[in-house]
Regions:
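N-terminal cap/lid segment of alpha/beta-hydrolase-fold proteins
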Residues: 1-20
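Gly/Ala-rich beta-loop-alpha elbow adjacent to hydrolase catalytic centers
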Residues: 98-106
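Conserved alpha/beta-hydrolase
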Residues: 43-67
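The alpha/beta-hydrolase serine catalytic core
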Residues: 95, 116-221, 225
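Catalytic nucleophile-loop/oxyanion-hole region of alpha/beta-hydrolase
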Residues: 64-89
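Short beta-strand element of the alpha/beta-hydrolase
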Residues: 23-31
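The serine-hydrolase catalytic nucleophile loop
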Residues: 32-45, 202
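Alpha/beta-hydrolase active-site loop signature
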Residues: 33, 60-65, 127, 225
Length: 225
């Protein structure tokens, strides 16, 4: 596995890992707070190595081994990171594989580079999650804290409380997708566990309805998390 760093175009280095092979190249887009050392990323890399298929893993700014600060991140910045990695480190047709927030980032990247899309895979994809799963679930007092302080720390089952910034919420509103048709023509596969405690499985059904392409399939795993 080749490793390196690439500038995201805004002065921040992004860490990446890449494996050469046959196309299309798979690009993994991690979730909020996750990185390329996670289980899904490493499993995908192992599968690609076994199949002799090209794959690119990378960390968003403020995540994993990349530079930057997590609380400076927004959906727009992380989508720009994804495009910097895709444009600078891949060539030819792509299959984007997005997990949770990575599904949203991946959709934004796919819409920005439609001519390169050979396919899109969403794993519990969470487009618009800053609004639908964060802002709309906040209590009035939590919203007031966020507006006043610019950051709200919410409990996380995975470790330390997660900082949610006002900038993340406000920027997310500039990139919402689920309120209109999503013009993505490539084949799409949406995988979702019905026991997912973070992203409701119905999200994938709604996303499938919004996608305008004809080749869209949703796979639900009844006991999957």
């Amino acid at each position: 596995m080749e490793r390196g760093r690439i500038d995201n175009g805004a002065g921040t280095d992004l860490a990446w890992q890449r494996l050469g092979g046959r196309g299309p190249t798979l690009v993994f887009l991690p979730g909020f707070g996750s990185d390329m050392t996670g289980d899904k990323a490493t499993a995908l890399a192992a599968l690609c190595q076994e199949r002799g298929q090209a794959v690119l893993l990378f960390d968003y700014s403020g995540h994993g081994a990349s530079g930057g600060t997590f609380t400076d991140g927004t959906i727009g910045r992380w989508a720009a990171d994804a495009l910097a990695a895709i444009d600078g480190l891949t060539a030819g047709p792509l299959v984007l594989v997005g997990s949770s927030m990575g599904g949203w980032i991946g959709l934004l990247a796919a819409l920005a580079r439609p001519g390169r899309m050979a396919g899109f895979v969403g794993v519990a994809a969470a487009p618009d999650f800053t609004e639908a799963l964060m802002w709309e679930s906040m209590l009035p007092a939590e919203r007031a804290t966020l507006e006043r302080d610019g950051v709200l720390h919410i409990p996380s089952p995975y470790g330390e409380p997660t900082p949610i910034t006002r900038a993340l919420i406000e920027d997310g509103r500039q990139h919402l997708l689920m309120g209109a048709p999503i013009p993505l023509a490539c084949p799409v596969r949406l995988l979702h566990g019905q026991a997912d405690a973070d992203v409701p499985w119905e999200t994938s059904l709604r996303l499938a309805q919004r996608l305008t392409g004809e080749d869209v399939q949703v796979v639900l795993v009844k006991d999957g998390e």
